[in-house]
């Protein structure tokens, strides 16, 4: 269990969050309608909101990654988890910051999704490496922001993306 469900709002980097890390200020009217009391969220309410959020995220991934349907379950889980935590636009490199923390990551994923055999495996391995470690323009290696804030999650998702 990487993160549990929190019934009571708590402070984090997004302000106040509740449930499975839902920033209260960013809950949509549709999502808020599923919650009786945002100050004491029930697990079934949080699960309903989570389903909406994940369904939207998956639809976006399907639109943006050609061959999404060929990606194996564990690898999809890793990509979905990463996108849920960091924002799908950041993972897909379509946000204003253009995925500055892993500049080659999504390129490897997209190429792997339409490749086969050893090439596919090699590309997923490269993408998994990018989750953890990057190289700057001067050739210096550094840990990604994601790894630094949630190392256990990053390492687990790294293994899943590798197909292990």
Kindly give the residue locations of the regions a language model identified.
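N-terminal mature-domain "stem" immediately C-terminal to a signal peptide or N-terminal signal-anchor/transmembrane
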Residues: 2-5, 16
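Surface-exposed patches in mature extracellular/periplasmic domains of secreted proteins
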Residues: 5-10, 62-76, 124-130
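Generic structural "secondary-structure junction" signal
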Residues: 10, 20, 24-26, 70-73, ...
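Substrate-binding/active-site groove segments that recognize
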Residues: 12-34, 54
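Residue-level detector of buried hydrophobic side-chain packing
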Residues: 18, 79-80, 127
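Alpha-helical segment that forms one wall of the substrate-binding/catalytic cleft
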Residues: 32-67, 73-91, 99-111
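Long, amphipathic alpha-helical surface segments
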Residues: 51, 88-164
